Amino acid sequence: KPNQDFMRF
């Protein structure tokens, strides 16, 4: 899910 990319940090 690309939406979870914001939680990669």
Curated annotation (Swiss-Prot):
UniProt keyword list: Amidation, Neuropeptide, Secreted
Recorded GO CC terms: extracellular region
Top-level taxon of origin: Eukaryota
Broad class of where this protein is predominantly found: secreted
Subcellular localization: Secreted
Alphabetical GO biological process terms: neuropeptide signaling pathway
Sites bearing Phenylalanine amide, chain numbering: F9
Family in the record: Belongs to the FARP (FMRFamide related peptide) family.
This protein's name: CalliFMRFamide-4
Taxonomy of the source species: Eukaryota, Metazoa, Ecdysozoa, Arthropoda, Hexapoda
